[in-house]
C-alpha cells in the first residue's frame, strides 16, 4: 500500500507539472512533491517502525497533499486516463497501474507530437523540457533535454525496483490473451477520459493502444529481481 500510494503521488505531481494547464503556482507545488517522493518514499517503505520511517511517512502525507493541490488546479494527463481503465478492467491497484505506465508515458509525452494540445496559456510544446527540469531538480544528468528525459525515466524505474514493484502488466499476473483482447476498447475509453484533455501531447487512440502493448512485458529478458516480483504478484 505504501509503494502503490506513494507512486500515485509521484504520478500526480509529474502529470501536473507537464499539464497544459500548469502555472507558476502549480509548478512550484508539483516540483516540491516530486522531490519529496524521491527522498522520503523509500524510507517510508523500508522503515515503517523506525523513527526515520515515521518521519518519512509524515513527509509522504504532506507530499500527497501538495501534489493534490497541484493537480487540482493543473489537472492530470493520459497516464491517469490509461491507468483508470487498466486498473478497473484487471483489478490492478491504481497507484501500481500508474507506476507501470509512468516511464512509458514520459517517453511518449517527451516526443514531438503530431497533434498539439491547445490551451490559452500553453503556447508551445514544452513537455520534454519540463521533464528535463525535473531531472535537474533531482540532481540527475540532464546536460541536454534528451538526457534529462532519459535520466528521469531511469530514476522512476529504479525507484519502482527499490519498492519491489512489478514493472509490467504481465508481472501482475494478467494473461496475455485476455489483456490484448481488451486493450483497443480500453484505449478508446482512455481517450474519452476526463484527464486526457490536459495532456501535453494530444493522443491518437492508436498511440494509446501502443502504450498498452508496450507495458505488457519487458522488451528485454526479465532480470532475476523482476522475475521474483512477478512470482510474488502472480
Could you tell me what each predicted segment is?
Residues 1-74:
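Carboxylate- and glycine-rich phosphate/diphosphate-binding segment that chelates Mg2+/Mn2+
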Residues 13-14, 34-40, 64-68, 82, ...:
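Buried hydrophobic packing segments
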Residues 21-29, 45-59, 74-79, 116-117, ...:
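Flexible, glycine/charged-enriched surface loops at secondary-structure junctions
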Residues 28-32, 36, 55, 59-62, ...:
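Amphipathic alpha-helical interaction segments
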Residues 65-98, 192-198:
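Glycine-rich phosphate/pyrophosphate-binding beta-alpha loops
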Residues 92-179, 218-221:
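Gly/Pro-rich interdomain helix-loop hinge
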Residues 178-234:
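Short, amphipathic C-terminal "tail helix"
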Amino acid at each position: 500500500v505504501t509503494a502503490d500510494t506513494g507512486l500515485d503521488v509521484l504520478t500526480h505531481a509529474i502529470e501536473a507539472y507537464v499539464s497544459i494547464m500548469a502555472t507558476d503556482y502549480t509548478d512550484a507545488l508539483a516540483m516540491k512533491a516530486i522531490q519529496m517522493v524521491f527522498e522520503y518514499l523509500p524510507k517510508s517503505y523500508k522503515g515503517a517502525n523506525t523513527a526515520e520511517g515515521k518521519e518519512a511517512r509524515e513527509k509522504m502525507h504532506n507530499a500527497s497533499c501538495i501534489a493534490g493541490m497541484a493537480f487540482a488546479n493543473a489537472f492530470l494527463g493520459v497516464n491517469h486516463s490509461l491507468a483508470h481503465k487498466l486498473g478497473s478492467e484487471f483489478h490492478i491497484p491504481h497507484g501500481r497501474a500508474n507506476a507501470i505506465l509512468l516511464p512509458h508515458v514520459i517517453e511518449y509525452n517527451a516526443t514531438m507530437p503530431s497533434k498539439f494540445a491547445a490551451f490559452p496559456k500553453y503556447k508551445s510544446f514544452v513537455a520534454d523540457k519540463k521533464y528535463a527540469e525535473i531531472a535537474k531538480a533531482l540532481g540527475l544528468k540532464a546536460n541536454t533535454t534528451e538526457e534529462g528525459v532519459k535520466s528521469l525515466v531511469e530514476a522512476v524505474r529504479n525507484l519502482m525496483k527499490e519498492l519491489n514493484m512489478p514493472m509490467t502488466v504481465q508481472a501482475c499476473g494478467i494473461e496475455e490473451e485476455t489483456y490484448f483482447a481488451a486493450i483497443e476498447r480500453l484505449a478508446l475509453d482512455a481517450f474519452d477520459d476526463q484527464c486526457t484533455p490536459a495532456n501535453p501531447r494530444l493522443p491518437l487512440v492508436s498511440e494509446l493502444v501502443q502504450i498498452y502493448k508496450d507495458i505488457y512485458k519487458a522488451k528485454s529478458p526479465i532480470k532475476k529481481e523482476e522475475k521474483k516480483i512477478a512470482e510474488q504478484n502472480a
